Amino acid sequence: MLRLRGVIAIAALCLFGLPAAAGEPRVKIVTALGTIVVAIDATHAPVTAANFLRYVDQKLYDGGAFHRTVTLDNQPTSDIRIEVIQAGIDPGLESRESAAIALERTNQTGLRHRAGTISMARDGPDTATSDFFICVTDQPSLDFGGQRNPDGQGFGAFGRVLSGMEVVRRIQRSPAHGQDLAPPVRILSVRRLSSR
């Protein structure tokens, strides 16, 4: 009986992810399609985590949206296909964006782009500001040395989904024109959760 409980506990961890480590900030993202809770890894990605939490604390994601869905079927010109959803602040608030941050590469942080990873969107290295994305499935091509971005520097992962992957998948499957969600999925609020 104890062995069965152990197997069930391990299976639950595999299905639902590890709980947030002590001291990891947790953030609740409430969208029009449901709620996603993420753990922010400020230990391994301090610059990226602080950047995201600054936007959260200033409530700049409120009224923003998940505006992009990348599926295996909507990347006809890409040899390296990924599955992510991308969100950002309300375009009317872009003048309140902070300066771009330094890219914390995954070969430095030890974090990886797995299903449920939250990471900062960027163009070139050191250009990330407010847009972030969540991996729908494992995305090793987004890590340092990966081939998705021609510069090979990867993206700055900084946390993981604790609950709400079904909401992530629902957003990814929402109607879109190409990769643009139509309409975008509104973000109602993004707040830190109190420490346990």
Language model features: what each stretch is:
Residues 7-17:
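Bacterial N-terminal signal peptides
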Residues 2, 17-196:
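Cyclophilin-like peptidyl-prolyl cis-trans isomerases
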